[in-house]
């Protein structure tokens, strides 16, 4: 079973690499992708937070925002309700998929025990996984994933070619 994680400095394009790789795989007939994807929420050019989306259903919510209440990570407040209703549920319901995407296992997501538990369920399965890992987290779950996954560091030189390389690796696995 193939498990790949991407990591790198903030803003380098980790989520973009994973999204583009997943897009390439989704073009294959009968290839079902589940899990979660995050994206920036911007207003007038300023980042105000992050959204979270269930890849199977398209359901979207707010992961963190400068306008929310909840546990604080930097200037953002984590929306535990959406993280658990959308994020944790998406991971639990992705067990019938050909690939589970987890974007991201980072500081905000790790504030939710339900999310951590859902990631552990995925890790205990035999499912292929493509994940984004926080670059410097010392959290036990992130450290486990670093040990168990092939970890690719995204940088300016490799980020354009990585989506195709990652997609090809998962295609070869089928």
Curated annotation (Swiss-Prot):
Top EC class per UniProt? Answer: hydrolase
Q: Which reaction does it catalyse?
A: a ribonucleoside 5'-triphosphate + H2O = a ribonucleoside 5'-diphosphate + phosphate + H(+)
The UniProt record gives the binding positions of ATP as 8-15, 99-106
GO terms (molecular function) for this protein are:
ATP binding; ribonucleoside triphosphate phosphatase activity
> Which terms are listed as keywords in the entry?
ATP-binding, Hydrolase, Nucleotide-binding
Keyword DNA damage listed? The answer is no
Enzyme Commission number(s) of this protein: 3.6.1.15
Record-linked Pfam families: NTPase_1
Describe its function: Has nucleotide phosphatase activity towards ATP, GTP, CTP, TTP and UTP. May hydrolyze nucleoside diphosphates with lower efficiency.
Q: Which family does it belong to?
A: Belongs to the THEP1 NTPase family.
- The protein's name in its UniProt record: Nucleoside-triphosphatase THEP1
* Organism of derivation: Methanosarcina barkeri (strain Fusaro / DSM 804)
Record lineage: Archaea, Methanobacteriati, Methanobacteriota, Stenosarchaea group, Methanomicrobia
